[in-house]
């Protein structure tokens, strides 16, 4: 059956009380590679028009396993070498720690075109930073940030041990299994993943706010791209805003490129005043502009701030409050990244490295101006 027809005939979703079970007894083993099933996906799953998200190469829809009633996520990719590469890399990683599992893959027709349909576990807990945003007045601590970074690092370590570079590690690709307190954080979307061999990666595709410096120039890059992204995510976790910004409203600007390539960022007060030196040191090691000097994933996992996360101070951070106050800007940044994902390519000629005495961070400037205005009327302090 054509997928389009199946969507129209999907009918109501199964009731929430239907017991859940594994979506498919034929799910691949850890790191397995398999051929897609050739029969109709609708034989096994009831499709919904509910869009759960947008990946690099295709949209993600809600679906239900007909036998068990379990809610799953379906990603639709039009068949191409790039799509098959995404499926292959995700299949190799599926079942690894803190990585979204593939449950089934089908090869069907959709709009008279051959497509691949990836059935994945449904991540009902939402995005990493949305979860922190929604905490309200409940403090988010440095120890919690360390535990989150350890989980993300565990996923990257699994990939790198199998010579896979994810190349698009960013907040939107980090999802929770549920809204429960003990939900597991997992990495998804292998649309830009590549196997790392003796030929270093050179394809200029990336998400601009989390892109390593060497991606912006003619240098080769490899797994160290993921390490740079870990540094940016860790920075945001500890303060609520990223270290680099485009001040022009573009997804990525020449000024932002220069700041990234020069590694120009700071640890401004008050957001960073109480953050431990161990955390700042780890960020510096991850954001090294020379990929050969950047930490490997093994070194990252062995860093005291990560492997001794239980003794990291429980210092309350500004992160949740900053994310809430700047929610509109954060959404704008995400929209810019989404639109840039599939279309942006690097123009090396625009990269002109000049020494910048200060970093002009648009969001930070706005925050400082607002703080200056409020401090004139009140001497109180917020030590969240």
From Swiss-Prot:
Renumbered residue ranges of the record's region Autoinhibitory helix = 309-345
Q: Where in the cell is it found?
A: Nucleus; Cytoplasm
**EC number, UniProt record:** 2.7.11.1
Q: How is it modified after translation?
A: Phosphorylated and activated by MAPK1/ERK2 and MAPK3/ERK1. Phosphorylated and activated by MAP kinase p38-alpha/MAPK14 at Thr-203, Ser-253 and Thr-315.
Alphabetized InterPro entries for the sequence: Kinase-like_dom_sf, MAPKAPK_C, Prot_kinase_dom, Protein_kinase_ATP_BS, Ser/Thr_kinase_AS
How is this protein's activity controlled?
Answer: Activated following phosphorylation by p38-alpha/MAPK14 following various stresses. Inhibited by ligand 5B (2'-[2-(1,3-benzodioxol-5-yl)pyrimidin-4-yl]-5',6'-dihydrospiro[piperidine-4,7'-pyrrolo[3,2-c]pyridin]- 4'(1'h)-one) and ligand P4O (2-[2-(2-fluorophenyl)pyridin-4-yl]-1,5,6,7-tetrahydro- 4h-pyrrolo[3,2-c]pyridin-4-one), 2 ATP-competitive inhibitors.
Q: Where is this region: p38 MAPK-binding site?
A: 347-371
| UniProt entry tagged with the keyword tRNA processing | no
Q: Which domain of life is it from?
A: Eukaryota
* SUPFAM superfamilies on file: Protein kinase-like (PK-like)
Q: Which segment of this protein is annotated as the motif Nuclear export signal (NES)?
A: 337-346
Keyword entries, A-Z:
Acetylation, ATP-binding, Cytoplasm, Kinase, Nucleotide-binding, Nucleus, Phosphoprotein, Serine/threonine-protein kinase, Transferase
Please name one Pfam family that this protein belongs to: Pkinase
Where does motif Bipartite nuclear localization signal 2 map?
366-370
Q: Where does ATP bind?
A: 52-60, 75
* Bias (Low complexity): 373-384
Q: Where is this motif: Bipartite nuclear localization signal 1?
A: 352-355
Residues with the modification Phosphoserine, per the entry, are 253, 309
Give the Gene Ontology MF terms in alphabetical order.
ATP binding; calcium-dependent protein serine/threonine kinase activity; calcium/calmodulin-dependent protein kinase activity; calmodulin binding; mitogen-activated protein kinase binding; protein serine kinase activity; protein serine/threonine kinase activity
Q: Which reaction does it catalyse?
A: L-seryl-[protein] + ATP = O-phospho-L-seryl-[protein] + ADP + H(+); L-threonyl-[protein] + ATP = O-phospho-L-threonyl-[protein] + ADP + H(+)
Give the protein's function.
Answer: Stress-activated serine/threonine-protein kinase involved in cytokines production, endocytosis, cell migration, chromatin remodeling and transcriptional regulation. Following stress, it is phosphorylated and activated by MAP kinase p38-alpha/MAPK14, leading to phosphorylation of substrates. Phosphorylates serine in the peptide sequence, Hyd-X-R-X(2)-S, where Hyd is a large hydrophobic residue. MAPKAPK2 and MAPKAPK3, share the same function and substrate specificity, but MAPKAPK3 kinase activity and level in protein expression are lower compared to MAPKAPK2.
Subunit info here reads: Heterodimer with p38-alpha/MAPK14. The heterodimer with p38-alpha/MAPK14 forms a stable complex: molecules are positioned 'face to face' so that the ATP-binding sites of both kinases are at the heterodimer interface. Interacts with TCF3 and with polycomb proteins, such as PCH2 and BMI1/PCGF4.
Q: What is this protein called?
A: MAP kinase-activated protein kinase 3
Q: What is the lineage of its organism?
A: Eukaryota, Metazoa, Chordata, Craniata, Vertebrata
């Amino acid at each position: 059956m054509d997928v389009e027809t199946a969507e129209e005939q999907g009918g109501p979703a199964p009731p929430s009380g239907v017991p859940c079970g594994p979506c498919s007894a034929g799910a691949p083993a850890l790191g397995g590679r398999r051929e897609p099933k050739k029969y109709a996906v609708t034989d096994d799953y009831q499709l919904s028009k509910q869009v759960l998200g947008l990946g690099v190469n295709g949209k993600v829809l809600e679906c239900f396993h007909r036998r068990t009633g379990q809610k799953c996520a379906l990603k639709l990719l039009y068949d191409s070498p790039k799509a098959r590469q995404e499926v292959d890399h995700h299949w190799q990683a599926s079942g690894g720690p803190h990585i979204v599992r593939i449950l089934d893959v089908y090869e069907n027709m959709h709009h008279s075109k051959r497509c691949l349909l990836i059935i994945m576990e449904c991540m009902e807990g939402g995005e990493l930073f949305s979860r922190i945003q929604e905490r309200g007045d409940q403090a988010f601590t440095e120890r919690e940030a360390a535990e989150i970074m350890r989980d993300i690092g565990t996923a990257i370590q699994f990939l790198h041990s199998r010579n896979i570079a994810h190349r698009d590690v960013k907040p939107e690709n980090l999802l929770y299994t549920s809204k429960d307190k003990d939900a597991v954080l997992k990495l998804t979307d292998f649309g830009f993943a590549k196997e790392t061999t003796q030929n270093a990666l050179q394809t200029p595709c990336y998400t601009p706010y989390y892109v390593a410096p060497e991606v912006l120039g003619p240098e080769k890059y490899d797994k160290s791209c993921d390490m740079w992204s870990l540094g940016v995510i860790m920075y945001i976790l500890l303060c609520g805003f990223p270290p680099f910004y485009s001040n022009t409203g573009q997804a990525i600007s020449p000024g932002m490129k220069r700041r990234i390539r020069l590694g120009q960022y700071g640890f401004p007060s008050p957001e960073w005043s109480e953050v431990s030196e161990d955390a700042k040191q780890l960020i510096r090691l991850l954001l090294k502009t020379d990929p050969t000097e950047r930490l490997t994933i093994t070194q990252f996992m062995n860093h005291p701030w990560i492997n001794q996360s239980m003794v990291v101070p429980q210092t309350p951070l500004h992160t949740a409050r900053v994310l809430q106050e700047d929610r509109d800007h954060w959404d704008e940044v995400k929209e810019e990244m989404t639109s840039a994902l599939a279309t942006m390519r690097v123009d090396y000629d625009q990269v002109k490295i000049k020494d910048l005495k200060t970093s002009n961070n648009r969001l930070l400037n706005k925050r400082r101006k607002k703080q200056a205005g409020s401090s004139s009327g009140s001497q109180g302090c917020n030590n969240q």
